[in-house]
């Protein structure tokens, strides 16, 4: 069953040929791990790797499901750089002494990384989301504009496609704007017309209460609780159960879930087969998490994979996007990747673009930045004398300006 393998190797790095190694003694279970650059890397002088991997040693702290703790470690100098994923921290809490004096720099780095999205994935294999009308009703009760303005500080954009903002987006997709009247109408069509003494809708034939459970990590609580409250107002009981990421992922891959709050990363070149091929729908451990099946999609997928004309490929993906939107295996929410929000102590050098065009991720720091001795001296001097350093522009728009 793999238990012996996991016990032996779960916290060991298998041999590889990359620029860094992780030594067994540099792994502190559940706390940190340190990568050390090889003395002589075989690909170091290759033209595609020049000026990369500039740090001799990097320690990565492990902070699970606690963005506030991650932020505090940065403020105390226990971390040199972090990405801020929670909008409220970025907007309300980054006005601290080190940031105001320029010791810690604050950047929103724009890139061309495909946005992706996050939202609610339905398990269409089982009740109640095996009924398309219930899936649609859920989406009509998903007040994304309100969530964005009141909870997410308008840091995100509404998504109505797997490929929002790109040429692949099907502009005819249903926008699913907040429409409680439409939701109630659909629920009645699905058989949910009256409420029980708890105030929740029950099916007219089975008398089954419209109630289900969503499993999330604690950091997602502030995003799903408002949805729970709206659903309750309209007679739907969504129970929230907090689980660790490992448990949630196992249940998702085993298809042991009813609804899941998740994110979908964007791709420069779409690869829909791994998520929507019908033969994957009833198998475990793949990306067709909702159990989507469509004969037309199965016809289009091999055509797309063997088509070399770009314009035609775009047409195919747009049709696929429309089919998926209509079947509605997920209630798409808001863009998953706004500009990267970075905080870092001002001791680093970096290329003009800061983060790569189609990566735009925190990990780019490890690949492309370097330790700047002169900057570090200036930082230490400013901290010693309670001085200030130049703040720099918060909005970093190198790729947008090209």
Where are these regions (language model features)?
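Immediate post-signal peptide segment of exported/extracytoplasmic ligand-binding proteins
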Residues: 16, 51-56, 132, 177-213
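Short helix-loop capping/hinge motifs at secondary-structure junctions, enriched
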Residues: 41-42, 126-134, 193
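Ligand-site clamp/hinge motif
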Residues: 6-11, 41-95, 228, 235-245
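Loop/turn elements at helix/coil->beta-strand transitions in domains of secreted/extracellular proteins
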Residues: 56, 78-80, 104, 130-135, ...
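Short, well-ordered beta-strand elements
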Residues: 18-23, 31-34, 55-62, 208-217, ...
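Extracellular/periplasmic solute-recognition and catalytic clefts
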Residues: 23-36, 61-126, 137, 145, ...
């Amino acid at each position: 069953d793999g238990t012996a393998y996991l016990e032996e190797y779960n916290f060991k790095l298998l041999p590889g040929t990359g620029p860094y190694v992780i030594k067994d003694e540099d792994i502190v279970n559940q706390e940190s791990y340190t990568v050390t650059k090889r003395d002589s890397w075989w690909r170091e002088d290759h033209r595609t790797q020049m000026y990369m991997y500039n740090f001799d040693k990097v320690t990565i702290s492990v902070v699970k499901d606690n963005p506030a703790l991650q932020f505090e470690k940065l403020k105390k100098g226990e971390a040199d750089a972090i990405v801020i994923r929670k909008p409220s921290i970025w907007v309300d809490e980054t006005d601290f002494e080190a940031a105001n004096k320029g010791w810690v720099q604050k950047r929103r780095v724009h890139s061309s990384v495909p946005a992706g999205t996050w939202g609610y994935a339905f398990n269409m294999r089982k009740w109640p989301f095996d009924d398309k009308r219930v899936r649609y009703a859920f989406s009509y009760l998903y007040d994304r504009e309100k969530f964005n303005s009141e909870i997410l500080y308008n840091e995100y954009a509404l998504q109505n496609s797997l490929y929002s903002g790109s040429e692949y987006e099907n502009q005819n997709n249903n926008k699913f704007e907040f429409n409680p009247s439409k939701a109630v109408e659909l629920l009645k069509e699905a058989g949910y017309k009256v409420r029980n003494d708890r105030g929740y809708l029950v099916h007219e034939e089975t008398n089954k209460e419209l109630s289900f459970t969503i499993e999330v990590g604690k950091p997602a609580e502030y995003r799903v609780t408002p949805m729970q409250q709206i659903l309750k107002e309209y007679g739907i009981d969504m129970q929230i159960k907090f689980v660790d990421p490992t448990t949630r992922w196992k249940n998702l891959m085993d298809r042991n879930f009813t609804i899941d709050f998740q994110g979908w990363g964007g791709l420069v070149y779409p690869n829909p087969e791994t998520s929507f091929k019908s033969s994957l729908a009833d198998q475990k451990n793949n990306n067709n998490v909702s159990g989507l099946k469509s004969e037309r999609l199965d016809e289009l997928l091999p055509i797309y994979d063997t088509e070399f004309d770009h314009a035609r490929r775009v047409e195919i993906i747009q049709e696929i996007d429309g089919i998926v939107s209509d079947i509605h295996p997920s209630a798409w929410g808001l863009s998953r990747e706004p500009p990267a929000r970075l905080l870092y102590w001002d001791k680093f050098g970096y290329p003009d673009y800061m983060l790569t065009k189609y990566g735009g991720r925190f990990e780019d720091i490890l690949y492309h930045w370097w330790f700047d001795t002169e900057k570090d001296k200036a930082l230490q001097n400013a901290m010693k004398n309670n001085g200030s350093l130049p703040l720099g522009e918060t909005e970093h728009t190198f790729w947008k300006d090209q």
